[in-house]
Amino acid sequence: MANLLRTLLLFNILPLLLCSVQTARAQSKLINTLIPDQLIMQYAGSIGYISGGIGYNLWKEKSTLSFHFGYVPKNKGGELDIAAIKLDYKPFTIHIGDQLIFHPINPVAFLSYTFGQEFGFEFDSQVYDKGYYFWSPALREHLGLTSELKILGDGSSKIKSISLYVETNTNDLYAINWYHDKKGIPFTDIFRLGFGLKMNF
Amino acid sequence: MRKKILFYLLALFIFSCNRNEFSPNQKFDATTPEDVNAREISELSKKTAGAHIRIAVSGDTHTDYTDSKGFVDYVNSQDDIDFVVLNGDITNFGLLTEFQGIYDIYNKLKVPFITVLGNHDENAEGNFVYQRMYGSPNFTFDYGGIKFVCHDANSREHSFDHTTPNLDWLRMNLSKDEGTQYIMAFSHVPPIDADFDQTLRSGYENLFNSTPGMLASVHSHRHSADSIYRANGTGIPFIITNTILNKTFTIIDITNGQLTTHPVTF
């Protein structure tokens, strides 16, 4: 995640540095672009016992791109450090009264990367011939669905609204196991839950 | 109508998946059993061995739950099997959910089952998962006058650093306990396989062949029909058994130190 953020920053900052003439307007625009639209806290959901993230709205809030960092403490099955990038899409919007917006079913895709000695990006080529183990221990590709309830504020606070969401996801390895024994592994068994809260600015 | 369908879908996906997960790589969760091998060995010690000992050796279940269930049902339908060995490769990726999936199935066996560490099980945090769930990868137990020596022979997972199999540990443990006359070894990777540290192979085979009362060394890993070889054509049999993926396991019968084997397809 650190690398990605760096790339993101570089792509935004470099053009400005190269320009000798900068307008204050351009600067404020850059800052506005970089300030996240959301702060996210999540429990479980395969990216940590607890994880924190920042999110950016895309396509008129139809979609969110978010960056997370998660941690599993030793007494919860760790210790593990995990970085994740998520992209979701909210095709349905249901207004309930004046204060609630419900996005019932939202596809989400994310990548997670587990840091640490046991988790190479790929297996050591000195020990394993190419293709001996085909997967990456560190990088997981996840697919899932979320359901999100947004509670609108009254406009007096900097936090415009708060979203509560539940997310179910599976990953490439669970899907492979399911594919090889569809009879023995019910499809729903490969999904895992997470719960989260977003503060929208 | 659209809303109804959406709500239905929502309820379905929330209630159908019942598990929180902190990471696919987490080493345990609230429901993970601990020290299963010690528990099963304790169960086995309560049994009284007859003159004939019959062991069902299964291997390489990976995450083939369907055939693993078929195996468990078959063994439960028999009444002459003393115990079951699961000789490694319980998982594909060394993940907790895979260990638990196979455990849940083998735990339905009416007879005790002893689980040995395979090479796939050492991936990611698998080594830790195994040790917390089952116990040490190198361990021994006695039954019916035979000492069983189970150990990690997955050299490649230890980068061929000449520590695995641990010959020092084997030398110490390949001695008869009080009340045992024979010794038998279980490990996942056979010495003839490229995944076994070939610099240790002759030392390993010679150690087994020079151990008094040694009956056999039993392996799996190769996913092929049962085969037996003897180092340099003499000495104890090195038995390589089939995989549960092929709906096949191996029966080992021991009577007065005489050992016979035959594959069973279920």
Where are these regions (language model features)?
Chain A
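Transmembrane beta-strand segments that form the barrel wall of outer-membrane beta-barrel proteins
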Residues: 33-46, 52, 62-73
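Bacterial Sec-dependent N-terminal signal peptides
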Residues: 1-30
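Outer-membrane beta-barrel domain signature
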Residues: 57, 63, 69-71, 75-77, ...
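Outer-membrane beta-barrel transmembrane domain signature
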Residues: 96-201
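Sequence/structural signature of outer-membrane beta-barrel proteins
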Residues: 37, 50, 70-76, 92-94, ...
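Feature captures outer-membrane beta-barrel proteins of Gram-negative bacteria and organelles
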Residues: 29-32, 50-64, 81-92, 193-199
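Mid-chain, structured segments of secreted extracytoplasmic proteins
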Residues: 75-110
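Membrane-spanning beta-strands of outer-membrane beta-barrel proteins
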Residues: 36, 47-49, 80-82, 140, ...
